[in-house]
Amino acid sequence: MRVILHDLSIEEKGAYLADQLRDTDKIIERKEKEPLPCMGCFGCWVKTPGTCVIKDGYENTGAYLGNAEEYIIISKCSYGEFSPFIKKVIDRCISYCHPYFVKRNGECHHKMRYSNSLKIKVIFYGDNLTNEEIECMEARSKAMAINLGTTNITTEYLKSFEGGIKLWK
């Protein structure tokens, strides 16, 4: 299964993604309400392990990742970072991990809850991306991948959607 998290409009999704989507894909996109930010309450770890306690339609994002082989994120660049919508959803994926810490590559990281190893592709888009923004986005993507227990990550940058958005086949 692929988890595809994006902040595209309905029109952009239809024009650039529709022909590449599979029936088995789990699409995480904007709903009528924006996702609420993670409260850091530990509820997804101790009250409802693997599921966020905030019931707003985005509570299962960590569990979706636990059943996925691929995680594709399409985000507008916002000052060298994920867009606010994407950032909130990524933060809510913390239930993908256990609350316990392990050392990986000399750094402290959460222990993985699931045994899968994600293949991650991040596609940032935006007009006039600066070198500084690209450096920040590259570092942020790699750090996120390490936190999710993988080093299998590809990061791409699009100045426009001409030529389309290429997902893995």
Predicted regions, residues:
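Short histidine/acidic/glycine/proline-rich micro-motifs that form metal-
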Residues: 77-79, 126-131
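Short, conserved loop/helix-junction motifs that constitute active-site signature segments
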Residues: 111-119
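N-terminal beta1-alpha1-beta2 submodule of the flavodoxin-like/Rossmannoid cofactor-binding fold
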Residues: 1-71, 75-98, 146, 157, ...
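Short, acidic/small-residue loops that bind anionic groups at enzyme active sites
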Residues: 93-108, 149-155
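Glycine-rich phosphate/pyrophosphate-binding loop and the adjoining helix
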Residues: 128-169
